[in-house]
Amino acid sequence: MNRRQFFPVLAAPLAGAFPRIVRAAKSKDRVIVIGSGVMGASIAYHLATRGAEVTLIEKDAPASGTTRNSFAWINANNKTPYSYYALNYEGILGWRRLQLEIGPSLQIQWGGGIAWCGPDPQQIDKLHYTTSLHQPWGYPIRNITRDDLERLVPGVHAGDFGAGWHSTIDGTLDPVAATLALVQAGIRAGVTLTKANVATIDFKGDRATGVTTDKGPFFADHVVIAAGNDSTRLGAQAGIPVPLRTSKGILAHSKPMPPLVHQVLMPAGLDIKQNPDGRIVAGSNFGDTGALAPTPELGAHLLERVTGVLPETRGIELDTMTLGFRVMPRDEYPIMGRGRQYRNVHVAAMHSGMTSAPAIGQLFAIEVLDGIETAQLQDFRPQRFYA
């Protein structure tokens, strides 16, 4: 579906089963959630299932910003300290829960993640560090041999194999399709999706009263900022510091191909996955791509490297290139919760929101509606950035 058609479609009645509301919010709290990427969509959904009256405000279309350009590897790899690892791990489990709640419209591939490298000692040490770090925390990851790799990924060309690991709990999804499924589930629960550009958050005394947009004012008891890289501007209005730094990511997307791979594959310097629609997605090890441009030439090069790893993709054709700007906090850790001045304004900004969105949605429903500060988010409060 064209994302530009999404708003009118969502305006139509949506039928289907909906998960039981566990505990209603008191006095039908009115909550505005700004931003309908995966983070905002999850928060809105979880608030609505608690009985809140939720308005989800999006300036463009759901999943049209950072979410659209995400590689969408669901994992808790190389996340330290333990509290950050645990938040991501809760996110993995949360996606499995959401599949049960939402149903088949939320497609996730649970094939695990596999990384390997050549004989370079530094790369080998890095891979072994990953397993040695996470196994004591209970993460289902293990070192693998070349034979293991070739058994797990039939037809793979391993090259000069030095070391590898296999994480069985990891998954991946199409970020746009998954976010739309969350938005639709939220609407079934009572979320109102509104296309508008938020200019200001409005205040009276020590509380936010709503927002002013290009479509007029909206009133609420709580405001949640989940606006991706625009969270810095909006947070500043509420006195909440949300320092983000630029981190770009380029991905090559192929035209649809027959099903070939169900894992996330990470040979040295390359990331490979296949979406449910058959498109191969390739990037370069999740780092900031700097001054690189998303040119067709770069896309062709990435897909050529894919064929070097998966010979069955011979003949693969480039469809599109995407350039994304990650929501990367200055210290690389999530920025979660309310500020000091206005206790009913909350912010949610992090990388990777794709993994942790289900957990954040569940935790924010508690924090916003019950006024409880959850233990899982204590290490990630905005207060650490106050002067």
Please place each PLM-identified region on the residue numbering:
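N-terminal export signals
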Residues: 2-24
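N-terminal Rossmann-like FAD-binding beta1-loop-alpha1 element of flavoenzymes
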Residues: 31-55
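Short hydrophobic core segments
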Residues: 34, 218-228
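Active-site substrate-recognition segment that forms the wall
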Residues: 45-49, 74, 97, 104-109, ...
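Glycine-rich FAD pyrophosphate-binding loop
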Residues: 49-67
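Dinucleotide-binding Rossmann-like beta1-alpha1 core, especially the glycine-rich loop
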Residues: 71-152, 269-271, 291, 305-310
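Flavin (FAD/FMN) cofactor-binding and adjacent substrate-gating region
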Residues: 93, 97, 118-189, 194-195, ...
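C-terminal catalytic lobe of FAD-dependent flavoproteins
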Residues: 315-387
